[in-house]
């Protein structure tokens, strides 16, 4: 009935088969400086 893998299956899982991937921010947050500059540009 359950779709969850059994404990035995989890224990035999080989982490070395996983590939290391570099995480890349798709939408990095602006720095405080950038936000301040944009605010001042918007006010003038």
UniProtKB/Swiss-Prot annotation:
Residues 1-44 are annotated as: Disordered. Residues 9-25, 33-44 have a biased composition (Basic and acidic residues). It is found in: Cytoplasm, Cytoskeleton. It comes from the Eukaryota. GO terms for cellular component: cytoplasm; cytoskeleton; cytosol; nucleus. One of its GO terms (biological process) is actin filament organization. GO terms for molecular function: actin monomer binding. Keywords: Actin-binding, Cytoplasm, Cytoskeleton. Ubiquitous. Pfam families: Thymosin. Plays an important role in the organization of the cytoskeleton. Binds to and sequesters actin monomers (G actin) and therefore inhibits actin polymerization. Belongs to the thymosin beta family. This is Thymosin beta-4, Y-chromosomal. The gene is TMSB4Y.
